[in-house]
């Protein structure tokens, strides 16, 4: 898996201007305590993911990086000896995340993320609040407000995956009770899982806080 995170014939220095490289390098050293001298061969989207997780940890005063929600519930399910099924493999997930965009495009988005850090932090706070409140309309509005993905990228990263998952869920859910954990952006919009489950005839209701 680590091999798939690395660039073969490029470096971050080749993908960025000298000024942008220096800016990103300084920010990564400040936030992640390591710069592009160590991360420079890693695909920009992977660097961006690691950077975002560190920012999330800092603004929420977490002592360690948060565990992904799907991984957290997977561990709980296995501990309770429940059957766990992946809607896609880790390799498939990593391939989509790291190889769906050209490396230059990934680098440009990383530079933009660093340059617009304050805006990104504010958006992350609002998104977190909306998620905890179960406000799907707010989540969708916030995403549309600052959505850097092109239509083609959204199709690959969100829509196609949702279509694949809904086919699997339609086969599983009529026969057994299922708990489904996905990223919040896979829930909302016309192609979101909630809307598609309703179209398939399922009743979808929010779970009240216990």
List the predicted regions and their residue ranges.
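A cross-kingdom marker for long, charged
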Residues: 151-210
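Structured, acidic catalytic/metal-binding patches in enzyme active sites
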Residues: 1-157
């Amino acid at each position: 898996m680590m091999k798939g995170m690395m660039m073969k014939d490029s470096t971050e220095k080749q993908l960025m201007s000298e000024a942008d490289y220096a800016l990103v390098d300084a920010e990564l050293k400040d936030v992640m305590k390591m710069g592009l001298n160590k991360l420079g061969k890693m695909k920009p989207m992977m660097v961006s993911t690691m950077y975002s997780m560190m920012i999330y940890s800092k603004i929420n005063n977490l002592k360690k990086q948060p565990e992904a929600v799907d991984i957290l519930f997977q561990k709980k399910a296995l501990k309770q000896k429940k059957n766990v099924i992946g809607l896609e493999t880790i390799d498939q997930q990593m391939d989509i995340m790291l190889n769906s965009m050209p490396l230059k495009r990934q680098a440009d988005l990383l530079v933009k993320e660093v340059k617009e850090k304050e805006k990104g932090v504010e958006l992350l706070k609002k998104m977190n609040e909306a998620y905890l409140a179960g406000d799907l309309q707010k989540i969708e509005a916030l995403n549309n407000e600052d959505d850097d993905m092109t239509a083609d990228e959204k199709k690959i990263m969100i829509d196609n995956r949702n279509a694949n998952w809904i086919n699997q869920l339609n086969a599983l859910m009529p026969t057994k009770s299922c708990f489904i954990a996905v990223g919040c952006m896979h829930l909302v919009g016309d192609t979101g899982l909630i809307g598609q489950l309703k179209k398939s005839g399922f009743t979808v209701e929010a779970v009240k806080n216990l």
